[in-house]
């Protein structure tokens, strides 16, 4: 979903920092084309496979083994050779948010900083139910914002000079 979101904004080159279960990620990408294509298997004479679809996604994806227990900075350092030396974006694999990538990049460029990190105020963990003795729910109170603090929302824009600090 993250790659489709970036692609919708015209960003189609990805470097994925692989660690835990990287073999599953690599297999998924290796099979992605076949899983999403119309295919004819011709076993009559030539035993060939014909894939009928054209390009599914306009993506170039590089998968890099960055280690099992490596922290974020170490992962960035390990993929440096696969980056083109320009401003790059970083998103955590569990990053699901309504972020306008073009606006994020424009904000980053307009402020001239080495790094821009999206921030969010997390909601409380649970909504509150008022329940009568017979089991009827009489009120539902939405989760409250915790303490008003901000957390890293997982979408970042970084300048190549960040490598000097890692």
How would you label these PLM feature ranges?
Residues 1-92, 103:
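Conserved N-terminal catalytic core of the sugar/cofactor nucleotidyltransferase
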